[in-house]
Amino acid sequence: MDKLKAYKALTKVIPQDLVLLDEPMKNHTSFKIGGPADIMVIPETIDQLKSAIKLSKENQMPYFIIGNGSNLIVRDKGMRCIVIKIAEQFSKVSFQGNTVIAEAGILLSKLSKKIMAESLKGFEFASGIPGTLGGAITMNAGAYGGEMKDVVKGAHLLNDNGEVRYFTLEELELGYRTSIIQKQGYIALDVELALEKGDYQEILEITRDLTERRTTKQPLHLPSAGSVFKRPEGYFAGKLIQDSGLKGQRVGGAQVSELHSGFIVNVGDATAKDVLDLIQLIKDRVYETFHVQLETEVRIVGEE
């Protein structure tokens, strides 16, 4: 695997300013941690995206897709691969009656505002979820009683052979924090949402209420990756962590949030090792106290 050879091949078909060598992943994750990616490509077109995938295969370099990096922990040694970032360069939105077709790179917060402006309801739950639409459908993101599978009609997905196909809701296999996209390594290009006509003022009030609940109950002022753990059946992860005496627990620059124990926050120059050591401490303590095995919701990637 020769990263310089791959870099040269990529810059022949993709503008050089969109291909970054040894790019620090802390600049591309909401946790603000993570070592360098060998190569990062930020494609602006589907053709550039396909070229990046094709060349990664030809150069025997694996590729990894990110959006806003808001559900991601990258280890300190970084990533020995080509990271392909699908973000604001893919953020077109169109409306056809109550149907919304949005590209995968749009932030959920921006999409929510556009949907609200059309007086369409059903997407309010997603208004405060950090991250892109592509990331949200990949993990079937949800909050406050709603999740992506409630509003998704279908999506265009790209496979590693460069083929694009439309998948229906059923074919997407959206489950609790999972989907066929995640299982098969597909890439979401755009998503079709089926919503309902609503009253603008009511939609605005619901959105404001959810925003207020988030602001008062979640540590939005500090870098984090959102909820660290999946919800164990019959329990709430945050309550188990708090009742295990871990609220405010710190390892290096990583801390269990004082505001919401389900969050780990970066209180200053945290390393991925700090975060991962704290995750292990939490898992061990919760198991010792309640005999409940916590599973991480965040994706943990990179070289050990």
UniProtKB/Swiss-Prot annotation:
InterPro entries associated with the record: FAD-bd_PCMH (IPR016166), FAD-bd_PCMH-like_sf (IPR036318), FAD-bd_PCMH_sub1 (IPR016167), FAD-bd_PCMH_sub2 (IPR016169), MurB (IPR003170), MurB_C (IPR011601), MurB_C_sf (IPR036635), Oxid_FAD_bind_N (IPR006094)
Transmembrane segments: none
Pathway(s) the chain acts in: Cell wall biogenesis; peptidoglycan biosynthesis
Keyword hit for Mitochondrion: no
Compartment(s) of residence: Cytoplasm
Family as reported in the entry's similarity comment: Belongs to the MurB family.
Protein name, entry field: UDP-N-acetylenolpyruvoylglucosamine reductase
Species annotation: Alkaliphilus oremlandii (strain OhILAs)
Upper taxonomic lineage: Bacteria, Bacillati, Bacillota, Clostridia, Peptostreptococcales
